[in-house]
Amino acid sequence: MSPFRISAFQSQTYQAAVILVVGLLMASTSQAENQKPEEPASFYDPVERNIEGWTIAVDPMLLNEANKEAGEKAMKALANHLQRITYIVPEKQLARLREMRIWLELNNPVLGNMQYHPGKDWLVKNGHDPRLVKHVHIPKAKHLTDRHMWAKHPYVVLHELAHAYHDQILDFNHPEVLAAYNASKEAGIYDEVLLYTGKKVRHYGLNNQMEYFAESTEAYFGVNDFYPFVRAELKEHDPRMYKQLEKIWGPIK
């Protein structure tokens, strides 16, 4: 059998094809080298402060001369929130609660309400600093000194820290909390309750087990904006959840 050979025509065609491919590769490489990568979003580096045992990531704008007074007022108000938590939460649970980090901003242009960020995906998708993950986030420092906020939600920082504790220490699907939440929904005990304004409304805690836990924690340790407002009312209105909070947070004497 004669050996396999490439004809002169085939050889010329092959060489031309190789030259064309090499040329395309060189052009593609050159284009890739010249193409500027997308610049990542620019985020400030917060300054760490310790307030009442909590690590606070502080927006540097709150520390400059122009906003010094606003920054001092905000941190003083935040200290007030954290002091009230310190004086009521048992030491063992308090030590874990202090592991929950807080991020304080002067004036976030997009976000308003205080919130907790359990995951990074939402932050990245919406153009926010991914370092906010697992932080209690106070987007607007002025809310800490807002009279309406104190009238409505005097334990708002505890509420957000309860979310962090639920996520990082317990688990959002903690079986006993979830069971108490589902039982309260089935019983309809939160379908129409008194709001701090005197109106009758659907309880905010019915949104999900996370809000149910945070709202109940406010009533257990302090004052909530929805009935049951305080610990004795929670014990009477939702005894099953009250018992779970005693197990989770420790009894209050």
Task: Label every PLM stretch briefly.
Residues R49-E72:
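Acidic/histidine-rich, surface-exposed loop or edge segments in extracytoplasmic proteins
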Residues A16-A27:
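Bacterial N-terminal signal peptides
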Residues K36-I51:
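Disordered inhibitory propeptide/activation segment of secreted metzincin zinc metalloprotease zymogens
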Residues K125-V136, H143, R147, Y181-K253:
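Metalloprotease/metallohydrolase-associated module, dominated by Zn2+-dependent proteases
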Residues E72-E186, Y242:
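Acidic/His-rich structured neighborhood in mature extracellular/periplasmic domains
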Residues M1-T13:
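N-terminal secretory signal peptides that target proteins for export/translocation
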Residues A57, R101-W103, H137, A164, ...:
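Structural recognition of the beta-strand scaffold that forms the well-ordered cores
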Residues S30-N34:
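Boundary at the C-terminal end of the N-terminal hydrophobic targeting segment
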